[in-house]
Every structure is written in C-alpha cells, then in structure tokens.
Amino acid sequence: MKKELLKLASKHGTPLFIVDHDVIRKNYRTFKKNLPRIQCYYAVKANSNQEIVKTLFDEGSSFDVASYNEFMQIYRYIRHFEEKAKDFYIWDKIIFSNTIKDMQTLRDIKKYRPLVTYDSEDELKKIAKHCETAGLVLRLKVPDTGSQVEMSSKFGAEPGDGYNLIKKAFDLGLVVEGLSFHVGSQCTNFDNYTTALSIASEIFNHARKKGYNLKIIDIGGGFPVPYDSQVPKFEKLAAVINSEMERLFPSDIEIIAEPGRFMVATSAMLVSKIIGKARRGGKIFYHINDGVYHTFSGVVYDHWIPNFSSFRKGKKEVCAVVGPTCDSFDKISVSEQLPGNLQIEDYLFTENIGAYSIASTTKFNGFDGAKILHLNN
C-alpha cells in the first residue's frame, strides 16, 4: 500500500485525499446486511462530495439532508424522473433532519412535500405557516453519554413534552409521521440506543392509543467506526438494535437511520508532506501542508484524534504535527509517535479520514484544501 500511495502522491501532489468507493459500497452493504429492517438515509453532512453522494445514490441509499443546498444535491439525480416517481422519491428517500429551518428554506421546499423534523412549538408554527405540505417527525432528546460528539444539548424535545408536541402539530392541521432521536456521533455506549428506543416506544404507543397513527421511527446515526481496536463491533450493536426493535415496535412501521461517519470514514486516507521541521521545547515539530483549518478540521469540530504513519523508518519519539497556517491554534497533534529522523519533503499518511474532514475545510490564510482523488468510482 505504501508504494502505491507514494506513486499517487508523486503524480498528483499533496495534500492528497484519496477516496476508495469500493469501501463505501462495502460499508453500505454491511449496514444493510446487519440491519435489514432499517432504511439507510446517508447523512450528507459527513462528506458531501458529489462523487460520494452519487455512489451511495447508485447503491440505493436514501438521504438525510440539513439544508436546501444539500436537498438540491440529491434532487439533481431525480430531476428527470416522472412527476409521480419524483414525488415518491422525495417522500420516501429524503428527510430534512435539521430541526430548525429558516423561513425561506421552508418556503423553498414546500412544493416538494418533504419529510422534516421538528422539536419545538415555535418550529411547528413556522412549518404550519410556510410549509404545511411537509410530513413531520418529532425529534426527541435522549441520552448521549460516552459518544464522541454529543447532540442533546442543542436538539430534541424533552420526552415529557413529546405527546403534547404531537397533538399540537395535528391541531395546527399538520401530520406527524413519526419520531426520531440521535444518541450522539461515534456512539460506543450501546445503552444509549436501548434507552432511546425505550423512550421513543413509550411516546409512540401513547400517541397511537390517542388515535395518532405514527408509522416511522428514525434512530438517527452514531454507528461506531473502528478508529482503534477498543471500538465495539458494529455487528454487536446491530444485534442489540434488531432485538429491541422487534421487542418494542410493531412490524408494520418503517424504521430508518442516518449513518454518515459509518459510510465514509474508512473509505479515505490523506497523504501530506512535511514542509518544515524544528525542535521546540525539546520536542520535534513536523510542519505539514494540511491542518485543522483544512482536512484535519475534524480535530476541532468532531473531537477526532487522527493517526499518522510515515514512509521512512526510524526510532520513534513523541512529536508534534502542526498545520501550515500562521495560527498557533493549528496543531493537529502534540503527542504523535513518529520517527525523529523524518526530513522536509517526506510524506505522512493518515487513514480513516473520510468523515467530517473535507466537509468543513476552509480557505484560511489562502491555503487551498486537499486535492481529491477518487478510486473505483
């Protein structure tokens, strides 16, 4: 693998973000195999690269979008469909999972009659005024203890308010199709899922008894990626979810999920180049041509700890790897085990960097983002 990476870096330049679409296909099929009852809605926010979206579209994935622009990314593939097929696709294959939408977005999507989430009475009033054609899914606040990125501090209605928010929606002339939750990104605490499913089932059953025919449960994302050997196996989580769904929910409802990281994290690696070397405070600093304002933005926004590997062998020591910008904040890692004999112009590579990386790249200091190379697309 190293020889091939060196060839690609030499040919295309660095930083080079390499995406293997066969890995994306494998991840999608693994998800479907282990959770056969669940319809997969890829969370576009994880990596919105159009080639990646196209691969998942071709695999049959549905999509979780957060904005009008993300919606239009998917719409471009169905623009040529007959009207009935187009309407069905939007209704069955796209969900606006952002619980807060500005009024213009609601007006823009009204004609498409999409499925949208909400978690407050004020959002209901906006939807009733500007997008009454939408189907609704109530987002619930659930525990996210132990997840890499928590969600519940910003999103989700308190479970105790759940039924009233369903009733309020119907009182406004809207239709609530189901419930959703998110246990936090990169969730390795499987109790979060069992607790969330239990919370959702109580509200679901209460609403049905009151005559509100809910028929969708959206279990969100959070499916863990094997960044290291300590991460529990996805197959183990899938078994837990399958068992709880069978126990708690009737067989006639639709179960959906919003995996993002799970689909793309392991599909990409980055080759970067050492552009400077210095010893500071007794520690070697390797300055590379990518950083936290670019492909390593996940260090900041995603609480992700990257791994670096070198092509040159040597005695390892604790080093710092920092980005190219003039901001001292641009430190990727200050405790990386790397050979101390690496030289300027040597390459480093980082695996499992497909999610929440190029999605939040900036042009800070005038530095461009990594070149993107697609394999097997």
Task: Locate the predicted segments by residue.
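General beta-strand structural signal in soluble alpha/beta enzymes
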Residues: 42, 63-66, 96, 117-120, ...
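Active-site-proximal loop/turn and secondary-structure-junction residues that shape catalytic pockets
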Residues: 23, 46-48, 69, 100-102, ...
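Active-site loop/helix belt of alpha/beta enzymes
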Residues: 142-276, 338, 365
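Conserved, mostly hydrophobic/aromatic
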Residues: 24, 45, 67, 109, ...
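A charged N-terminal "starter" segment
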Residues: 1-116, 121-129, 133, 171, ...
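ATP-grasp fold ATP-binding core
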Residues: 135-141
